[in-house]
């Protein structure tokens, strides 16, 4: 079987690795904007092209006799790549454009949840101009300001160190109104966690919970990023997430897929639910229509079920006939990013990977030239420790990072006992 992966980041490197482990011995191909050495090493062939160039991607898929495509990033979904592939008779793991909209139009997503009585939304309003904007911000008091469109996780700002007062929140919202709608939401207090699921249009196969860390600097300071690292626990939960919390989060995702199915376009691919665990249970921060990055790198190395079987079940609508299983291990993923990331990243600097021991290595936004690897303006290399405990997995990941050299920055605190305990204590205080 010939399988194509779209995208050239760390998430796609993890997807490619999972496909390459298949006992079905698929021939793997890729379309990516820059040569990711981790993906290229696993491929029979690859095309360097814009991942949003639908005509070129479909043409390449036809040329190579591709039977299934795994679409990694969100941008190709937003331009209808899954639609074009399916219309060409090629199976796509990735939803069609009108249901992928749940990610790339946050205003539509909130209204969709409201219209379908799906639990988990905070108080919110969508604004296309300044009328009533200041009054609503003042009414809520503490707010989150979100551009409606795709921002790579970096456009959202919340009250606190990012927006010190309602005046700053108003000014930021006004700055986003140029060419886009703005979503103003109640700023929820709690701990964030991610639940991801393979979806075949009606059935969901859930992966272990993960907690991502968006802030650039240790102790959760600095600007938002695409994600500096993440961890998962061996029981599929998180130290601050109960079975009941997870049940409610999954029920929200199931209700969302059921409602999307009623639109006459089945949602086939990955549904990513980013939740915040509050005093009143899990609430939805956002939905994404693909694997998270870095969260894919936590869960895919644990996948026991053959990835080709999972992809086939997604495409054919038969996930209910497949037992999708994961190893009961803990993981810690840490990113090395260019110095100055995300605001003023150091570009075109060589990255040298030394002895990473037992860690897994996933290349992200880098490029290979003359046998050497260089940074771009985004996250460079991720390492993943896999062990029986989060603490042991963190040690594996951190030791690996220490042996990757270049003009790079990383967070040492992700997955450490101190940071994990801080999350647990925070939730204990909130639940009182």
Curated annotation (Swiss-Prot):
Protein name, per record: Phosphoribosylamine--glycine ligase
Cofactors named for this entry: Mg(2+); Mn(2+)
Binding site for Mn(2+) 1: 274, 286
Keywords: ATP-binding, Ligase, Magnesium, Manganese, Metal-binding, Nucleotide-binding, Purine biosynthesis
Pathway, per record: Purine metabolism; IMP biosynthesis via de novo pathway; N(1)-(5-phospho-D-ribosyl)glycinamide from 5-phospho-alpha-D-ribose 1-diphosphate: step 2/2
Source species, domain of life: Archaea
NCBIfam families linked to this entry: purD (TIGR00877)
Binding positions (Mg(2+) 1): 274, 286
Molecular function as annotated in GO: ATP binding; metal ion binding; phosphoribosylamine-glycine ligase activity
The family this protein is said to belong to: Belongs to the GARS family.
UniProt remark on cofactor binding: Binds 2 magnesium or manganese ions per subunit.
Record domain ATP-grasp: where: 110-316
InterPro entries: ATP-grasp, ATP_grasp_subdomain_1, PreATP-grasp_dom_sf, PRibGlycinamid_synth_ATP-grasp, PRibGlycinamide_synth, PRibGlycinamide_synth_C-dom, PRibGlycinamide_synth_C_sf, PRibGlycinamide_synth_CS
EC number(s) given by UniProt: 6.3.4.13
Substrates-to-products reaction catalysed: 5-phospho-beta-D-ribosylamine + glycine + ATP = N(1)-(5-phospho-beta-D-ribosyl)glycinamide + ADP + phosphate + H(+)
Binding residues annotated for ATP, in chain numbering: 137-194
Organism for this UniProt entry: Methanococcoides burtonii (strain DSM 6242 / NBRC 107633 / OCM 468 / ACE-M)
PROSITE patterns listed in its UniProt record: ATP_GRASP, GARS
Pfam families associated with the record: GARS_A (PF01071), GARS_C (PF02843), GARS_N (PF02844)
GO biological process: 'de novo' IMP biosynthetic process; purine nucleobase biosynthetic process
Residues annotated to bind Mn(2+) 2: 286, 288
Residues reported in the UniProt entry to bind Mg(2+) 2: 286, 288
């Amino acid at each position: 079987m010939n399988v194509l992966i779209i995208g050239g980041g760390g998430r796609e490197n993890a997807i490619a690795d999972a496909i390459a482990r298949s006992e079905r011995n698929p021939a793997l191909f890729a379309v990516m904007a820059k040569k990711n050495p981790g993906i290229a090493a696993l491929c029979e062939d690859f095309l360097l092209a814009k991942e949003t160039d639908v005509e070129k991607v479909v043409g390449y898929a036809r040329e190579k006799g591709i039977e299934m495509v795994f679409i990694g990033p969100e941008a190709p979904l937003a331009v209808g790549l899954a639609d074009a592939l399916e219309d060409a008779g090629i199976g796509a793991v990735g939803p069609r454009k009108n249901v992928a909209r749940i990610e790339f139009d946050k205003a539509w997503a909130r209204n969709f949840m409201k219209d379908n009585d799906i639990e988990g939304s905070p108080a919110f309003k969508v604004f296309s101009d300044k009328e009533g904007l200041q009054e609503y911000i003042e009414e809520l008091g503490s707010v989150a300001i979100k551009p409606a469109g795709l921002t790579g996780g970096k456009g959202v700002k919340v009250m606190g160190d990012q927006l010190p007062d309602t005046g700053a929140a108003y000014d930021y919202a006004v700055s986003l109104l140029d060419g886009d709608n703005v979503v103003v939401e109640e700023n929820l207090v709690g701990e964030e966690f991610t639940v991801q699921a393979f979806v075949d249009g009606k059935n969901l196969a859930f992966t272990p919970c993960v907690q991502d860390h968006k802030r650039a600097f240790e102790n959760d300071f600095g600007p938002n990023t695409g994600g500096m690292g993440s961890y998962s626990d061996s029981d599929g939960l998180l130290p601050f997430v109960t079975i009941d919390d997870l049940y409610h989060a999954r029920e929200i995702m199931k209700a969302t897929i059921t409602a999307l199915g009623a639109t006459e376009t089945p949602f086939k691919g990955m549904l990513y639910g980013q939740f915040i665990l509050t005093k009143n249970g899990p609430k939805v921060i956002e939905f994404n229509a693909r694997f998270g990055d870095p969260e894919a790198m936590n869960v895919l190395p644990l996948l026991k079920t053959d990835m080709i079987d999972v992809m086939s079940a997604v495409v054919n609508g038969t996930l209910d006939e497949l037992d999708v299983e994961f190893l009961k291990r803990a993981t810690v993923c840490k990113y090395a990013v260019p110095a100055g990331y995300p605001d003023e990243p150091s570009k075109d600097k060589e990255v040298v990977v030394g002895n990473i021991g037992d860690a897994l290595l996933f290349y992200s936004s880098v490029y290979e030239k003359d046998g050497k690897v260089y940074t771009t303006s985004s996250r460079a290399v991720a390492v993943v420790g896999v062990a029986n405990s989060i603490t042991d997995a963190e040690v594996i990941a951190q030791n690996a990072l220490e042996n990757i050299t270049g003009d790079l920055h990383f967070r040492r605190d992700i997955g450490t006992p101190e940071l994990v305990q801080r999350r647990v204590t925070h939730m204990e205080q909130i639940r009182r």
